[in-house]
A protein has these predicted regions:
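Hydrophobic beta-strand scaffold residues
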Residues: 13, 37, 102-103, 149, ...
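Conserved acidic, metal-coordinating active-site core of Asp-based
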Residues: 98-200, 207
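Short, structured coil segments at secondary-structure junctions
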Residues: 55-58, 66, 143, 198-200, ...
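Short active-site oxyanion
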Residues: 34-38, 58-60, 181-184, 198-202
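Active-site metal-binding loops of divalent metal-dependent hydrolases
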Residues: 9-11, 43, 188-190
Length: 231
C-alpha cells in the first residue's frame, strides 16, 4: 500500500547540513517505492524555493504558508486561500505594526508585499517575545471567525485564513491520491503542526513546542530519516 509522509521544513526536515542530506536520501528511497512525500511549511513560496534550490530538494506536493497554498511537484497551484479583505485593516491595527521589529505580507504572486495589496495569503510580524505572544493571543481571540494566527520561531506571529491549515491542506491531497488514512504520516515541531499531528499518524521532533509534545504520546524522533525507517 502506498504511504504519504508529510514533513515540516524548519527544525524538522532541516536541523543542519549533515542531517538534511540524510533526510534527502531517505526521502529519495521512500519515493522510489511509489510513496508520496509532501513538504508542509510556514515559509512563503520565495523563501522555501530558495532553500529548495540550495539543498536540491524533491517532493510530490508542497504546502506553503501553513496551508494557505498547495502546489504539485510541477508548481501547478491546486488550492489557494486568502485572508478576508474586509478584516485586514482591523487586523493591521491590532498588530500594532509600528511596534513590530519587521513585518511583511504574502499573496499568490509575491512573497514580500504589504497591506495595500489585496488577496493576502499570509501576514508575518516579528516582535520581542512577550509582545509576540500577546499579539498572537489577541488575534486568535478577536478574529477566530476569520483567521488562524501562529506563534512561530524568531518571536513572530503569522496569520492565514481560518479556512485552511496544514491539516486541511493534507486532506485535499489525500482526496486526490486516494491513500488510506492509516498510511498517512506527519512530522513537525511547531504550533502550526499540531492539527496535522493530531489528525494523522503524527510524530514530533525532540525539540518540539510543549503543546505538540503533549499530544505525540511518546512518538518522538530525532529526524525525518529515523521516522522513514519506522514506517
Amino acid at each position: 500500500m502506498r504511504k504519504i509522509l508529510v514533513s515540516d521544513y524548519d527544525q524538522t526536515f532541516y536541523l543542519n547540513d549533515e542531517d538534511i542530506e540524510k533526510n534527502k536520501k531517505s526521502v529519495e528511497n521512500f519515493r522510489k517505492q511509489e510513496n508520496i512525500f509532501i513538504f508542509a511549511t510556514g515559509r512563503s513560496y520565495f523563501d522555501f524555493m530558495n532553500k529548495a534550490e540550495q539543498y536540491k530538494l524533491k517532493w510530490d506536493y508542497l504546502i506553503i504558508n501553513h496551508g494557505a497554498t498547495i502546489l504539485d511537484k510541477n508548481n501547478n497551484i491546486i488550492s489557494n486561500y486568502t485572508i478576508d479583505n474586509d478584516v485586514i485593516k482591523n487586523i493591521k491595527k491590532d498588530l500594532e505594526i509600528e511596534e513590530a521589529i519587521k513585518y511583511f505580507c504574502c499573496n499568490l504572486e509575491n512573497s514580500r508585499t504589504n497591506f495595500n495589496d489585496k488577496d493576502l495569503t499570509k501576514i508575518h510580524a516579528k516582535y520581542e517575545k512577550n509582545k509576540a505572544e500577546q499579539i498572537n493571543s489577541l488575534i486568535n481571540k478577536k478574529y477566530a471567525e476569520f483567521v488562524n494566527c501562529y506563534f512561530v520561531s524568531g518571536n513572530a506571529v503569522e496569520i492565514i485564513s481560518n479556512k485552511t491549515c496544514k491539516s486541511n491542506a493534507i486532506e485535499e491531497i489525500v482526496q486526490i491520491e486516494k491513500v488510506n488514512r492509516e498510511n498517512i504520516f506527519t512530522i513537525g515541531d511547531g504550533y502550526s503542526d499540531i492539527e496535522m499531528i493530531k489528525n494523522y499518524n503524527g510524530y514530533c521532533m525532540e525539540k518540539s513546542v510543549q503543546e505538540l509534545l503533549k499530544i505525540c504520546n511518546g512518538k518522538i524522533v530525532k529526524s525525518v530519516s529515523e521516522l522513514i525507517e519506522k514506517i
